[in-house]
Structures are given as C-alpha cells and as structure tokens.
C-alpha cells in the first residue's frame, strides 16, 4: 500500500491528531474539574458544573486509551523507553485518574456536605495532575531523556523521577494546565448560564493569558537556552534499529525545521493567537467560535512541539545516538499497514458516534434541569 517511510510518517501524523483530539475532548472535562472550586460556590452550582460533562466524560476517556494503544502498537520502542523513564510519573497519572470515575459516580450517593466535598477534591486531583504530568513529560522530551540502548537493544534508564522536575518541563506542565483550563472554561460558556457563566468567562480570560505567556516563554527558552538534536544520517526506509544513525546536538537546533520551512510558523502562530481569539469570541457572546479557537490552539501547540522535535520522538540526553526517531522506533511495515486499515475503518466511526452523542445530549445545564432530572444526574 505505502512504502515504509510513508507509513512511518502517516503514523506520526495520526498519533499527533489523536493527541489533539484527546486534548480537546478530555481536555475540557479535565478543565472543568480544575475549575470546579473556582466557579462553583454551592452544591447546586457544583452539580451544574459536573453535569455539564456528565454525559460525555466516559466517552472522552476513549481518546486517552486510544493514544496509549497507538503508541504501544506503532512505536513500541518509544513505549518501552518512555514507561521505563517516566514510570513513576505514569503511575502518578493512573492513580489520579482513578479518582475521576469514583468522584463522578459516588459524589451524589450520600447527601452529606463532607462526603461531597471529599469527592470534589478527588475530581480536582484527577483533573489537575494528568495535564501537568503530560506537559512535564513533553518538556523533558525537548531537553532529552536520560536513557540509552545497549548493543543488544535493551533500554536502560539512567535518571530519576526528580530529575524530570527541572524549570523548563515545569513551565511546560503549567502551559498544559492552562490549555485544559482554557478549553474547560469555554465549555462552561457553552453549557451554563448565570453566575457560573460569568465566572468561567473570567477564568477563561486568565487561562488564555497564562497559555500565551507560557508558550512565548517556552519558545524563547528553546531558541536561546536549550540545545537541539540534529539527525545527520539515517535510512528512513531502514530497519527499526535506533543505533544505526548519526546525531549531533547543537545550540538552537530545535528551530531548524521552522527556519528551513517558514510555512510551518502557522502552527506556533495558532498556538499563540488562538487563546486571544478565544477570549474575544466569548466576550462577544460567541462561545461556539470560542471553543473552535481553543481547539485550534490545542492543534497549534501540540503540532508546534511535534514539528520542533521532528524527526525525533524521544531524544536521549546521555547517548544521542540512542535517540528515537520516527524512522527507527516503529513496528514492522506489515504491522503499520494492518493498523492503518483498521484505523481508517474505525476512527471515522468513533468520531461519528461521538459527534452524534454531543448532538443528542446538547443543551445548557441549569438549576431547573437538575430539579427535573434529580434522580438521573450526578
């Protein structure tokens, strides 16, 4: 169907698209979880915020599972190296995610303020920790992860969890948190009225400012303060052996792709200006356009990171030759071909039933809605 090089590039694009859809869909329900203590002051208001995503949060989790499955199937070496290096971080994410279904399902079981406050805290933790950790992980990819391959292609991680928490990755974690809060704030603009609507408007404005500042600072930091990786020689159609290439580490090299192809600047421009356009849209009473702009922001930021790294997927800070690229970290050509056929069949189906569910369950959440559906809503 396609040659090996083309298949590898297609799967790089597909994983990027899956990450974007995850940050849009799961991003807004994690965003409302982070905003819960800021925009809701009593139990009715908290129930309105929670039920604004009550019909969708479980379906949104599919994209996280799909992203993990695609990473495992298409980039097994990346999966192995990442889970070796980020093991503690991934366990932290999984443990925090456990709070989300429990909080949604058990919060309303007992009409007790302390009980509900406990599960509200669990929902905040389960919504705040994953985006921060994912952002920190992406930040470490740009710095390089301390791992190496032996001549037998066994991966060895040579760092510790605390080494991941340096200033640049923490900045990326803050950027990721701002992105989901912005998406969640715009969602509340679409789904609520009254005081929650007004408070989420202010939260959206502040999140947009945070995203713009963090994104600008991260870009400048990459340009002047972080050495980038350059692929000097590798066969894009060759076997998936990470030791069969030449790699150099040079100052400012992460900007090379944008210098060589100026048209790619469209992605960082989207990442920087779309938060501003989001705020302009919601203050003009057009939250639908605001949600679109926030979604384009996710697209711009994520693909800016991907293009910056390209063709690297997981650089190594201790053994540059061990760095993983999309040319040497993939499954076999047959595996990629079979998976591509499966994705082309089932991904549109998933998208269609997801959009259908949003269409059928659309409508603003109000106090009257809670009263009419007292026994059905969270």
UniProtKB/Swiss-Prot annotation:
CC cofactor note: May bind up to 3 heme groups per complex.
Subcellular location: Cell inner membrane
Catalytic activity, as annotated: 2 a ubiquinol + O2 + n H(+)(in) = 2 a ubiquinone + 2 H2O + n H(+)(out)
Top-rank taxon: Bacteria
Induction: Induced when bacterial cultures reach stationary phase; synthesis is triggered by phosphate starvation or a shift from aerobic to anaerobic conditions.
Stretches that traverse the bilayer: 9-28, 80-99, 123-142, 165-184, 206-225, 262-281, 292-311, 336-355
Keywords, alphabetical: Cell inner membrane, Cell membrane, Electron transport, Heme, Iron, Membrane, Metal-binding, Translocase, Transmembrane, Transmembrane helix, Transport
Pathway the protein acts in: Energy metabolism; oxidative phosphorylation
Record GO biological process: aerobic electron transport chain
GO molecular function, one term: cytochrome bo3 ubiquinol oxidase activity
EC annotation from Swiss-Prot or TrEMBL: 7.1.1.3
Disrupted gene: phenotype observed: 3-fold decreased ubiquinone levels but no change in redox levels of the ubiquinone pool (in aerobically grown minimal medium with glucose).
The protein's enzyme class: translocase
Annotated Gene Ontology cellular component terms: cytochrome complex; plasma membrane
UniProt cross-references to NCBIfam families, sorted A to Z: cydB, PRK15028.1
Subunit structure: Heterodimer of subunits I and II.
Function: A terminal oxidase that catalyzes quinol-dependent, Na(+)-independent oxygen uptake. Prefers menadiol over other quinols although ubiquinol was not tested. Generates a proton motive force using protons and electrons from opposite sides of the membrane to generate H(2)O, transferring 1 proton/electron.
Protein name: Cytochrome bd-II ubiquinol oxidase subunit 2
Organism from which the protein derives: Escherichia coli (strain K12)
